[in-house]
Amino acid sequence: TGVQVVAPIQLDALHPDSSGRLSFDPKVVYDQYNDTFLVVYLVQADSPRLSLIVAVAIPDATASNTGTWCPTSFPGDAFPGSPRLWADYPGVGYNDTRVTITTNQFTFPSSTGRFRHSQIMTIEKTGLYDCTQPAPMPTVFGGTKTRDTNGFQSFTLRPAETVGSS
């Protein structure tokens, strides 16, 4: 309805792992399948080296009650076998059962970071949207799995937001 229901909140206040660290690149989508807003943002620190992807599910019906919000964090460098990398340029998409988050992966430190590869993280909604459920375990693709048909590394992938019954 366009009416503000909650006062502005700093990103680093949405999840305890964000506190006192650089929180950036927020993305917000409305998941019509579950009547839930999803806020995704990144957290990064050079010392000690840290990279997180934070997702906060906000049920539309109870959005004014921040106690019903469900924050979850994932390692920003979740691709197995990868050197320590930090995530940047997130993209967010969803369908009726999963949320997909894409990022570009850079080397530390951030001031001289070099692009390594794109990362695709797909997560079942159950634990992501309901904090009474066990934390979800994402499926992650990166490295050679995110190359284009010519063998080049993809850059800034964007997952789809599906609408409708299929």
How does the language model describe each region?
Residues 1-166:
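C-terminal PAP-associated
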